């Protein structure tokens, strides 16, 4: 998968310095009990970005952050583990590679809110927001009563082989132009 490509190496210290599963589960249980007692809602946001080593001079420093489609398999697997651990009762907000190709499946599995960033930073990105809304707007919305561990497990398993999350064998041509972008005076543009 894209997440395991050779150039996306991570150092164990990222895992060792982060919250460990055996500490996280009891903490989440305590926080959920406290939220229930206070008549509040509690949930987890997964996962934002993931630090990986810079190995090919992509950036001037030693680290960069994985996001977008390559992060999806890791994030959905964490959702899978949390959903199973808590019997589908833990609220999960998703921010780890959500896009047009999976937003409906995430929503149907009871994972929401769904936030996106990487997909809209690409060419045509804001048009994708419209496409994503169209894809989920007719789906039934229901108040949270749990997520679907089986559906999340299926998403996690399929993410490992879904071509949307795999690096192409033949690299795509660069979309970047070598031309200098012209200056544009927006005050001269008339919008009617």
Predicted features and spans:
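Conserved, mostly hydrophobic/aromatic
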Residues: 44, 82, 106, 114
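Ferredoxin-type iron-sulfur electron-transfer modules and their immediate structural context
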Residues: 127, 131, 138-192
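Alpha-helix-loop-beta-strand connector modules within alpha/beta enzyme cores
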Residues: 27-34, 67-88
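Structural preference for beta-strand elements that scaffold enzyme active sites
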Residues: 39-45, 89-93, 113
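Short, small-residue-biased leader/transition segments that mark boundaries at the very start
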Residues: 2-7, 191
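Catalytic cores of alpha/beta
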Residues: 98-112
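Active-site beta-loop-alpha junctions enriched in small/polar residues
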Residues: 1, 47-51, 95-99, 119
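Glycine-rich phosphate-binding active-site loops on the catalytic face of alpha/beta enzymes
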Residues: 109-131
């Amino acid at each position: 998968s894209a997440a395991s490509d050779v150039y996306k190496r991570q150092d164990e210290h990222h895992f060792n310095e982060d919250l460990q599963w055996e500490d996280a589960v009891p903490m989440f249980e305590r926080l959920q009990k406290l939220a229930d007692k206070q008549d509040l809602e509690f949930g987890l946001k997964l996962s934002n970005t993931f630090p990986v080593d810079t190995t090919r001079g992509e950036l001037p420093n030693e680290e960069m952050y994985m996001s977008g489609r390559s992060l999806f398999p890791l994030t959905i697997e964490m959702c899978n583990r949390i959903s199973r651990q808590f019997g589908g009762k833990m609220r999960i907000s998703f921010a780890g590679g959500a896009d047009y190709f999976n937003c409906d499946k995430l929503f149907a599995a009871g994972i929401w809110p769904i936030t996106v960033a990487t997909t809209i930073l690409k060419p045509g990105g804001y048009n994708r927001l419209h496409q994503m809304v169209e894809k989920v707007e007719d789906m039934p919305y229901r108040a949270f009563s749990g997520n679907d561990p089986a559906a999340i497990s299926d998403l996690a398993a399929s993410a490992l082989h879904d071509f949307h999350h795999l690096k192409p064998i033949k690299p795509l041509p660069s979309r970047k132009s070598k031309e200098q972008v012209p200056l544009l005076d927006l005050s001269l543009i008339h919008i009617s």
